[in-house]
Regions:
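Surface-exposed, hydrophilic segments of mature proteins
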Residues: 1-119
């Protein structure tokens, strides 16, 4: 599964180094400030039975798109690459001085040999 974690980070410049904040995350609520354009064929879990989707997503109870998990639903062979998940990401908020936007991607997987043991 994959989760996108959008953050603003203080730049690695002299002023931020002097203030001892270079590289640190800016404390900011990102809800409603990030737009994702998903690849073709990425569908909501509820409609996954209707298509031949490789990626499905499951919304969180909060409804915040930044809390959404994406699942690749096919096993990959060693060296094989999954279908594309994300085409584009846009940050729509204000950037505080000496900061930049980062999209951190958290990914987890299981070995194909473990599939028989999944419940």
């Amino acid at each position: 599964r994959v989760r996108f974690v959008p953050v603003l980070v203080y730049d690695d410049n002299e002023q931020n180094k002097k203030d001892n904040i270079a590289g640190q995350t800016v404390p900011l609520d990102m809800r409603g400030k990030v737009d994702y354009i998903l690849a073709d064929g990425v569908v909501a879990e509820a409609s996954s039975q209707e298509t031949e989707a490789k990626w499905i997503y499951k919304d969180s109870l909060s409804g915040d798109i930044n809390d959404r998990y994406y699942y690749y639903i096919s096993a990959l062979e060693p060296g094989e690459v999954s279908e594309m998940l994300l085409k584009e990401v846009t940050y729509n908020g204000e950037l505080p001085e000496n900061t930049h936007f980062e999209l951190r991607v958290l990914a987890e997987g299981i070995a194909k040999a473990q599939l028989p043991y999944l419940v």
